[in-house]
Amino acid sequence: MHIVVVSVNHKTADVSLREKLTFSESSIQQALSALINQKSILEGVILSTCNRTEIYAVTDQVHTGRYYVKSFMSEWFDVDIETIKSATDVKVGNEAIHHLFKVITGLDSIVLGETQILGQIRDSFLLAQSEGTTGTVFNKLFKDAITLAKRAHAETDISSKAVSVSYAAVELSKKILGKLENKKILIVGAGEMAELALQNLVGSGATDITVINRTAEKAKSLADQYGGRQVSLQELQCALIESDIVISSTSSQEFIITKPMMQDIMKLRKNKSLVLIDIAVPRDIDPEVNDIDLIFNYDVDDLKGLVDANLAERERAAQVIYTMIDKQVISFVDWINMLGVVPVITALREKALRIQATTMDSIDRKMPNLSERDRKVISKHMKSIINQILKDPISQAKEVSGSENRAEELQFFQEIFNITNEVESIKNNEPEVRRSKNSFVFNPEQ
């Protein structure tokens, strides 16, 4: 039994190929069914986001498992197998476990430490579980991964520091003015940077938002999407008079906001302070507005310093999380190794209990007048003797779980105690690796 992950991400393939290798939300259930019916694959989870497509599988053999996962991707996406091979990164065993933990904690994301991937993996796992394509191994592995990611974000500040200019603009606004719920915010521009700023503003509680753009239709579309209002470019000066925060991001080659304009506006504002954040290149705001009292003006260079400092803090937090990951990998591998030992220990205990029961039956026949108290005393001492005799063999069996030759050593262990048939019987009566749809469902809130 082996854990395999086949990954297509921003490091292995360009966006034009990643677009072709993406599962639509409506197709994943069907894809899971097709995946689990491939040869060699015992359990499966599919993760598909805008930046990565990953297939996690428990396989009976490493080489055949890798082959059939890639073959499945080739058939599903109608892409030749050589393209799949060149566009994928394959990890097996401990490396596959480490990869999942690294991805779910945000350490493999374009934005270091982002938290969205945690929810995406959680949803992918729960869907696979509901479809019956996970079992003993993945139910444990993904539960551990989700718990680890929550702990990593709770115990470090890796996701709390802005590492994009648009997000930094919003964080700077909060630092200067505090909560944004009652602040009047003006967005000048309707491009990608402006939209990212809007997303973060709304996420930070801002509700009073005005959008201005040279193209009114774009401004209205963006304003409607985020619950704001749109005004024309001709109303810019009126909007500046009313605003507490201005974030500007246009493609203009000239200043949109000039020093003379702001001198007039500040008089009408009755000396109320104004925060100007210019995230455009070239700049939208004349840097000479810095000479005007009560104007706090910041450009991309100011924000870049904040972003660089925050990124350095995230990287320090990442090192802490890597230590958490290493420990969790060891813990999970120990658990995996114990799966093969448990039937052996169970068989040994059951054999000892049968010997005890047979011996007690013999005592009862030969000493029929024993009182109930005497029987309990004898039984108690027999259990004590059995536990003492089994203590060292069981301890040795657990030690074997970490050995590279554990299969051979466990077989030798079974032969010494003559429990090979009992072990096979226990294995045959265990639940299948892959569970049914009605099996236990992991609750991620527990």
From Swiss-Prot:
Q: Which UniProt keywords apply?
A: NADP, Oxidoreductase, Porphyrin biosynthesis
**A single GO BP:** protoporphyrinogen IX biosynthetic process
What InterPro entries does its record include?
Answer: 4pyrrol_synth_GluRdtase, 4pyrrol_synth_GluRdtase_dimer, 4pyrrol_synth_GluRdtase_N, GluRdtase_CS, GluRdtase_dimer_dom_sf, GluRdtase_N_sf, NAD(P)-bd_dom_sf, Shikm_DH/Glu-tRNA_Rdtase
Q: Which reaction does it catalyse?
A: (S)-4-amino-5-oxopentanoate + tRNA(Glu) + NADP(+) = L-glutamyl-tRNA(Glu) + NADPH + H(+)
Annotated positions binding NADP(+): 189-194
**Broadest EC class assigned to this enzyme:** oxidoreductase
EC? 1.2.1.70
Q: Name one Pfam family in it.
A: Shikimate_DH
- Its annotated pathway? Porphyrin-containing compound metabolism; protoporphyrin-IX biosynthesis; 5-aminolevulinate from L-glutamyl-tRNA(Glu): step 1/2
Is Oxidoreductase included in the keywords of this UniProt record? yes
GO molecular function annotation: glutamyl-tRNA reductase activity; NADP binding
Does NADP count among this protein's keywords? Answer: yes
Annotated residues that bind substrate are located at: 49-52, 109, 114-116, 120
What is the annotated signal peptide range for this record? none
Q: Site positions for Important for activity, renumbered to this chain?
A: 99
Active site residues per record: 50
**Leftover remarks:** During catalysis, the active site Cys acts as a nucleophile attacking the alpha-carbonyl group of tRNA-bound glutamate with the formation of a thioester intermediate between enzyme and glutamate, and the concomitant release of tRNA(Glu). The thioester intermediate is finally reduced by direct hydride transfer from NADPH, to form the product GSA.
Q: Summarize the subunit comment.
A: Homodimer.
**What domain comment accompanies this record?**
Possesses an unusual extended V-shaped dimeric structure with each monomer consisting of three distinct domains arranged along a curved 'spinal' alpha-helix. The N-terminal catalytic domain specifically recognizes the glutamate moiety of the substrate. The second domain is the NADPH-binding domain, and the third C-terminal domain is responsible for dimerization.
**Which family would the database say this protein is a member of?**
Belongs to the glutamyl-tRNA reductase family.
The record, for PANTHER family, names: GLUTAMYL-TRNA REDUCTASE 1, CHLOROPLASTIC
Task: Fetch the NCBIfam families from UniProt.
Answer: hemA
Q: What does this protein do?
A: Catalyzes the NADPH-dependent reduction of glutamyl-tRNA(Glu) to glutamate 1-semialdehyde (GSA).
Q: What is this protein called?
A: Glutamyl-tRNA reductase
Organism of derivation: Macrococcus caseolyticus (strain JCSC5402) (Macrococcoides caseolyticum)
